[in-house]
């Protein structure tokens, strides 16, 4: 740590938003010096986003409420600095990159900030070349931002901040949008920035991956208050393993100490008997080619997805995972080949008609939310599909309950734009559930969610009456392995593997070629699990190993302790 004076000083920070009854964050104190990396972790709603807003000046300049304590940057109070000046010191990468990108092309996006500073064109061009190399996005130069995948947008958002050359980098939940190999590359980049003398604040739910950054300290928040601030080792001993995704060996150590509670979720009932469902496949792709403009993304994809299946789609950023389901919803049209739903070609069906079959949740919730209140968002779809208004209240209550939003203060009258990214993501899922679809399609369902929330709604939706199948795109390997019956593995617009999780994992070279990396839970299941058995959730596997119970095929993907 190169300098005597900290870059960041937080002294007794407490903040309560207007109309809220309780503070979002309470009595947080923290200093960050040049060259230091601080990981901020904690359950959803613990105050992480509020802390970010206080660091970058959005509190108190844009978010009003009751503020006490102080935040100082290079010795100056944030409250006394204009936002323009704060933004030159603190660069923030948002959870949802779609809300951060304003340029039509990658080059114009990278140039946007420096142009607003009045930098000469040649300086900007040189900086674009250097930043594109450092951010590993040279291959994106020349592309339109509207055609980028979610992970590619995440890297572009990071590059846009690099263009501004701030002293402090605040990065909010970047890993959910990135495949594991690209996520590791981003973490290396952040460590390089710290080694160059920058301060780095990483807010992340996926703690196991974030620890590869080797943070100097961890700030762990619970219910808005600091529970722990110190080295990684102490954090692993105090963090709630049911809310924070810890390395498996840390969970096992906690289980041996009796600190991992039994799984509180009841196992879902068996999926609908495939024989009882219409024999036609839910989705059939036959030699599908599709893309955006002149750029083809899917190259001759053929696959059949059945009702009564839970299917996870994994693969590198930009490999065609999202495009696969956009083609099913007619959000894009194949250039050749065909897509059929329940045996009928999609070209003969309208998007509204397909909405009666599929509940589709975009990767970015901002693409789905437009109404003034949460209540209006939830009633819009049922009203347009002709669902009896007398049933709306029950649909709304059930949908909010399944995604863990029912108990949020005054939730129905809140504006969706005031919700956190994680809450917006859960609201988007609730909107899809309110349509009572036959099949739920989720793009990155765990983005912005803590471990408990992601596991909870993935289990809860399986019990919805009439819901036959769940198809989800994810970079969360553990989520796929513990919840899916089947995995489709994508690479370069083609399916390179298709089968049950354990069979797909057998070819480790192919796994690595698809930018996937073994997790500690994956290795523990593979080493200790019974051959052919389902993957167990981390807490369940840890409790069994702690009790020295034999591992047999005793349970499904719910992972509940018996």
Where does each model-flagged region fall?
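Conserved ABC transporter NBD signature motif
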Residues: 64-76, 337-345, 354
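Conserved ABC ATPase "signature" region
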Residues: 122-140, 390-410
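Catalytic Walker B motif of ABC-type/P-loop ATPase nucleotide-binding domains
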Residues: 169-173, 440-443
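Conserved beta-strand-loop-alpha-helix hinge in the C-terminal portion
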Residues: 225-247, 494-521
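Helix-to-loop junction immediately C-terminal to a conserved catalytic motif
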Residues: 56, 329
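Conserved ABC ATPase signature
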Residues: 144-148, 152, 415-419
């Amino acid at each position: 740590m190169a300098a005597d004076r900290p870059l960041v000083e937080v002294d007794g920070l407490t903040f309560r938003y207007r109309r809220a009854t309780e503070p979002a964050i309470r009595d947080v104190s923290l200093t960050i010096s040049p060259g230091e990396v601080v990981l901020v972790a904690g359950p959803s709603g613990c105050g992480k986003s509020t802390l970010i807003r206080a660091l970058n000046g959005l509190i108190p300049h844009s978010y009003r409420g009751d503020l006490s304590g102080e935040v100082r940057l290079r010795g100056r109070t944030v409250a006394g600095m204009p936002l323009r000046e704060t933004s030159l010191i603190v660069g923030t990468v948002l959870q949802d990159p779609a809300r951060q990108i304003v340029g039509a092309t990658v080059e114009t996006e990278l140039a946007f900030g420096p142009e607003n500073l009045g930098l000469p064109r040649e300086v900007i061009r040189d900086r674009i070349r250097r930043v594109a190399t450092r951010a590993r996005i040279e291959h994106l130069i020349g592309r339109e931002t509207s055609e980028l995948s979610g992970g590619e947008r995440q890297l572009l958002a990071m590059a846009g901040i690099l263009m501004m050359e701030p002293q402090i980098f605040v990065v909010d939940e970047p890993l959910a949008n990135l495949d594991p190999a690209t996520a590791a590359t981003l973490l290396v980049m952040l460590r390089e920035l710290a080694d160059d003398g920058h301060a780095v604040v990483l807010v992340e739910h996926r703690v196991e991956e974030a620890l590869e950054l080797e943070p100097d300290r961890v700030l762990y928040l619970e219910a808005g208050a600091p529970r722990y601030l110190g080295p990684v080792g102490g954090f692993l001993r105090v963090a709630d393993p049911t809310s924070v995704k810890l390395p498996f060996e840390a969970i096992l150590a906690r289980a041996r100490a009796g600190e991992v509670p039994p799984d509180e979720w009841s196992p879902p009932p068996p999926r609908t008997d495939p024989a009882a469902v219409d024999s036609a496949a839910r989705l059939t792709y036959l030699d599908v080619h599709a893309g955006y403009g002149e750029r083809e993304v899917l190259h001759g994809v053929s696959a059949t997805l059945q009702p009564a299946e839970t299917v996870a789609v994994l693969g590198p950023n930009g490999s065609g995972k999202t495009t696969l389901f956009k083609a099913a919803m007619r959000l894009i049209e194949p250039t050749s080949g065909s897509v059929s739903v329940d045996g009928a070609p999609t070209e003969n069906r309208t998007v509204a008609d397909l909405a009666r079959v599929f509940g589709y949740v975009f990767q970015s919730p901002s693409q789905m939310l437009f109404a003034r209140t949460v209540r209006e968002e939830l009633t819009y779809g049922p009203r347009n599909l002709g669902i009896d208004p007398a049933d709306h209240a029950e649909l709304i209550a059930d949908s909010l309950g399944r995604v863990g939003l029912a108990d949020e203060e005054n939730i129905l009258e809140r504006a969706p734009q005031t919700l956190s990214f994680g809450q917006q993501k859960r609201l988007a899922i609730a909107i899809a559930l309110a349509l009572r679809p036959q099949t739920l399609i989720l793009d990155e369902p765990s983005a912005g969610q803590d471990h408990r929330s992601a596991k909870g709604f993935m289990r809860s939706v399986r019990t919805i009456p009439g819901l036959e199948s769940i198809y989800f795109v994810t970079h969360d390997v553990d989520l796929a392995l513990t919840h899916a019956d089947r995995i489709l593995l994508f690479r370069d617009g083609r399916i390179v593997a298709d089968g049950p999780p354990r069979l797909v994992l057998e070819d480790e070279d192919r796994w690595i070629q698809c930018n996937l990396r073994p997790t500690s839970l994956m290795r523990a299941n593979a080493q200790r699990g019974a051959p052919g058995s389902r993957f167990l959730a981390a807490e369940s596997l840890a409790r069994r190993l702690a009790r020295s119970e034999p591992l047999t095929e005793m349970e499904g993907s719910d992972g509940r302790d018996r």
